[in-house]
Amino acid sequence: MADPILLRNVRPWGKAPTSLLLEDGLITQIAAQLVPPPTATIYEGQQQLLLPGLVNAHAHIDKNLLGRPWHANQTPEPRRIRDYVDNERRLRRELELSTHTQSALEVRQAIAAGVTHIRTHVDIDTDAGLAHFEGVMQTRAELNAALTMQVVAFPQSGMLIRPGTVALLEAAVKLGADCIGGLDPSTVDRDPAKHLDTIFAIADRHGVELDIHLHEPGTLGAFAVELIAERTRALGLQGRVTISHVFCLGMIDDAYLNRLIELLVENRITIMSLGSGNGPFPPLKRLHEADIPLCTGTDGVRDTWGPYNSVDLLDRVKFLGYRCGFRKDEEVEFLLEIATTGGAKVMGDNDYGLAVGCRADLVVVPGDTPTQAVVDLPPRTFVFKAGRLVAENGVCLV
């Protein structure tokens, strides 16, 4: 059993200074003045901000190029989803990347940046089989004490158009995948009903959740949202389905959007948005006001799709705030809530937070306010996972 920890003089969400006692992985006391047990290790917060652990609810840790020579993007025109996928699959074969090595490198960088939870999609196709999945599962096993990870079995190259993929997805679920993924059921597989019926059937058989990539635009994407909601309701999977990206929600007229909002609320479907690209994306404030669960993430980091994303969730919040046109502190903090509490909810973590009894997943970071931390992106002073120090001054310790 680890010694207790006293985290002294920190400001939860920028509020009044206080101290926390961490014991057996939990927050056991919060008070301005705490007398630590004789065996406690004391960490001085120096009135810095205290945030709950950052939650990356949409990652692709299997495909980064971190630690390798710079990759100049080579995706050919017209740069559709299919073009990115084909280019990526070719380069992964040529570069002979170790998914375990690359995913472990990304996770350690994320831990240094205050990330305590990751939901990662992992490519499963008939070229690589389960190799990428197995590499990520190895990383999860090695770092499970330092980070909570969920794995989504993801048919990035298509499913129905590549015979054998469905069996591989189901095999991944049997081997421990937490979620089954999907991808653009009309534009990729060209059969939206069969695509969705297939992945929902796998989820229903094995009791896993669904997290579906939906890039399809306008009314085509909106139609897919309707089909997803229908199947969620029919199988009683309310609260167990996430739709990621969902650009269509920012492209349809108000009347249609209102109908979709009703379906999303009724079926407790989570929307994951990270504001990627330069086109429309979901109206996050409006969805939040309708009580639709929201989360965000990094997407792929430094990969064959593009060079820009980083492992830092505060950087993602900053970018998302820019894309939303947010300038007020309360607006930025709303996005930070999505990157913390929102992500923890979608990952089903009921022990998350900054209250007594919560697991001690904590980030100490300089800044007068949470918004300043988002804008300045300073190194994280301390990162704790279940009451264990896992990063200090921007350096991962595991």
Where are these regions (language model features)?
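Active-site gating loops and adjacent loop-to-helix segments of metal-dependent hydrolytic enzymes
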Residues: 65-99, 206, 224-242, 260-263, ...
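Active-site core of metal-dependent hydrolases
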Residues: 153-163, 174-282, 293, 302
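Alpha-helical scaffold segments that flank or form the walls of functional sites
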Residues: 67-121, 127-142, 168-174
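His/Asp/Glu-enriched, well-ordered alpha-helical/loop segment
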Residues: 230-241, 285-367
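C-terminal cap of metal-dependent C-N hydrolases
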Residues: 356-398
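N-terminal metal-binding scaffold of metallo-dependent hydrolase/deaminase domains
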Residues: 1-38, 48-50, 370
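Divalent metal-coordination and catalytic microenvironments
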Residues: 10, 25, 47, 58, ...
